[in-house]
Amino acid sequence: MSIVTPYIPREYLALRINYCKQQLAELPNVVRSERNIRGEKKTVLVSESHCYSLNSTSGRKLAEVIQRRELLSCKLSRLEGLWNSAFRGLPPADIEPRKIIRSFVDSTGESVIIDGKFFESLKHNSNPYYPEHKTHYYNGTYYRSAAEADIARFYTEQGIPFKYEPEIWISGMSRPIYSDFVILIRELDLCKFHEHFGLKNSADYTRKTSTTYNNYSGAGLLPELDVFYTYDVDNIPFDIRTLHTKLNSVIYDSLFGVDITL
């Protein structure tokens, strides 16, 4: 049995590395130091030439900064190791974290920006229809297929926030839609809609797929930019590398495809 070569998403990996570097640069410098206080040695935290007790409010906040710096440094080291194993040189500097503005028109005619605030407003697993079809369990949620459970596992392991089947009202609809997945790309403060289609040989399902595509487009969400699609193949397990390639593509197009940054 041959070993499947993993797909490493170049642009998305570069974005994650540069985001880690940006976050580290924004943190204040804090160091632990031993000081003689009233004849007794005590550990204090020093930041911007000021000393803070570990038990003070400021000291506890600075201790959290130290912990966050350590976590980010470990994450950066891991991501850079992955980069060096696959690519030459440094991650491109032009793949930089920044806020990208995309929006859709909701059922009231208002424009809704699909950013972190929108993501937080969504309720995870809110589709009330056909609960009996949710038979595949992962991490506290039942999914409608093994492929959807694998997708949820992928997003969880990659540290990508997602909501499964949240209720969303879009233009032209008399009832809400329930996207399979809405994910948040923190590095761009930008949401993406992910629809996973199965039952490709079913005529009814094919019509549903076409309707879903048209509904998103009618609300101003562009295919393969705001919304991306994955598909089941008969008698073949879903290849998660497909998701890597799709993610990399929509992120690349968000960064360089159109002038939509803020």
Each language-model region and where it sits:
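Acidic-and-aromatic substrate-binding clefts and catalytic sites of carbohydrate-active enzymes
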Residues: I168-P176, S202-D204, V233-D239
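Active-site metal-binding core of divalent-cation-utilizing nuclease and nuclease-like domains
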Residues: T141-Y143, T156, P161-E187
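Nuclease-adjacent, charged terminal/linker segments that flank catalytic cores
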Residues: M1-F118
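Basic, glycine-rich
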Residues: G218-L262
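Conserved aromatic-histidine-acidic binding/catalytic patches
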Residues: T5-I8, Q67, N139-Y143, K200-D204
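Short beta-strand-loop-alpha-helix junction that forms the active-site gateway
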Residues: T135, Y178, V182-T212
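Solvent-exposed, charged helical/coil patches
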Residues: P97-I160
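Class I S-adenosyl-L-methionine
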Residues: Y155-T156, Y213-S217
